[in-house]
A protein has these predicted regions:
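Glycine-rich phosphate- or other oxyanion-binding loops that anchor nucleotides, phosphorylated ligands
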Residues: 2, 25-228
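Short, conserved "active-site rim" segments that organize catalytic pockets and cofactor/ligand binding
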Residues: 1-19, 85
């Protein structure tokens, strides 16, 4: 069985639609099949605490041959564009299949405790770590996999870049502590900053682009992976 971890269903929905024989258990784990592989999809939530706890619980209940850490990631420079797909070589313990090498960027991914809100923060993180993209979960998912001897492959799609950043302050977009968007707060922010409405609409398009690219890349990856 191959497991796929996403932070949120907004990241996984297009891939999940590709699965045959879909079912969902009482913990929200989605079971299905694609290209002859049995797969289970679970959602960790956003950030270190959620990713560690949910991944540990999943691995205590299931024994995947491979876990794919997936979802969205932010580019640290504009060499990556929205919709590009990154293979995080520093966290992956399996090689990327050769058939994906021409369409998937390989590089270093950093994981942080908070969303980065400015191009300056992105530049500083890149200089400090050598990373080309950032997320909030993969490092912590990788630690749980390492502890249990589970092979890991990280494949993520770019949803934002220095020139196409988050449209609103991160705390307005998503409350990590509560694992949800505060919609009354979001509406209040937009009422006070109407110019942000257009930016939010553009970002919604960026997310859709990343979701499509990710589903395509995951479909190609699972087609290329050998069957155990």
């Amino acid at each position: 069985m191959i497991a796929l971890a996403f932070a949120l269903s907004a990241e996984s929905s297009e891939f999940v639609s590709l699965l045959a024989q879909r079912s969902r258990d009482d913990r929200g784990v989605i079971t299905g099949a694609v290209h002859g592989h049995s797969v289970r999809v679970f959602h960790t939530g956003v950030g270190q605490a959620a990713a560690q706890a949910v991944t540990a619980d999943f691995l205590a209940r299931h024994a995947p041959a491979l876990l794919i850490s997936s979802g969205f990631t932010g580019a640290l420079d504009d060499s990556l564009a929205v919709g590009d797909v990154l293979f995080a070589a520093n966290y992956s313990t399996r090689d990327l299949p050769a058939s994906l090498a021409e369409t998937v960027r390989q590089g270093t991914l950093a994981s942080t405790a908070a969303m980065l809100d400015s191009p300056v923060e992105r530049t500083q993180l890149a200089a400090r770590t050598g990373a080309i993209a950032v997320d909030m979960e993969t490092e912590f998912i990788a630690a749980e996999c390492h502890q249990r001897g589970v092979a890991l492959l990280s494949l993520r799609a770019i949803s934002d870049t220095p020139s196409a950043p988050f449209p609103l302050p991160p705390a307005v977009l998503f409350n990590v502590a509560r694992q949800q968007t505060n919609y009354p707060g979001l509406l209040l922010y937009l009422a006070r900053h109407p110019g942000a409405i257009g930016r939010l609409a553009r970002f919604t398009g960026q997310v859709a682009t990343a979701r499509r690219s990710l589903a395509t890349a995951l479909d190609r990856l699972l087609r290329a992976l050998p069957h155990s």
